[in-house]
Regions:
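Catalytic centers of hydrolytic enzymes
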Residues: 1-174
Length: 174
């Protein structure tokens, strides 16, 4: 959940913290940790549908996706707006130039990294979409995740990697 804007100009770690400052990790420090889960291709498309349908009426619920591209038509019915969905194949040779896109396989599992709060909210999509969409976070074997604390990403010292810190590290790269 993004809580503040980043304006053009000099940025600080404190500004990055303000953007993603919600929550407390299991380690007792500020900020939700990042977690890694797996979604099927069909579920990735469902997340895109949620974004395309809900964001226009509730901007605070916007999902900011990286490595994905989709096209949608706002004149179509809710939760049926996305008509094209792709994943991006990016080269990390320094310039992060886009190589190509490829279609999403509905049955394949894709690794997704997100904040703990967002990950825990994914399984509410079925109820909130009146059963039209379903997103169930899974482990690498395709089994539903019941304990998100087991999916927390940690640095080499075992510390939780926080959402706000990931943003600060990204901003430092500029």
């Amino acid at each position: 959940v993004l809580r503040a804007n980043l304006s053009a100009g000099d940025l600080t770690a404190a500004m990055a913290f303000d953007v993603l400052s919600m929550g407390v990790g299991e380690d007792g420090t500020s900020g939700f940790p990042l977690v890694a889960v797996y979604l099927s291709g069909k579920e990735l498309k469902a997340a895109m549908e949620v974004d395309a349908s809900v964001t226009p009426i509730m901007p605070a619920a916007q999902l900011y996706m990286s490595g994905a591209e989709y096209r949608f038509n706002t004149n179509r019915m809710f939760f049926n707006r996305v008509y094209a969905a792709y994943l991006e194949d990016v080269s990390f040779d320094g310039d992060c130039s886009l190589q190509n896109t490829y279609e999403i396989d509905d049955h394949a599992l894709y690794r997704v990294v997100t904040g703990m709060y967002s990950a825990q909210m994914l399984d509410t999509v079925k109820d909130r979409s009146f059963g039209l969409l379903s997103i169930v976070p899974k482990d690498e074997h395709g089994e539903p995740v019941t304990d998100f604390s087991q999916r927390i990403l940690r640095d080499r010292n075992g510390n939780e990697i926080k959402e706000w810190y990931a943003l600060a590290a990204y901003l430092r790269s500029f």
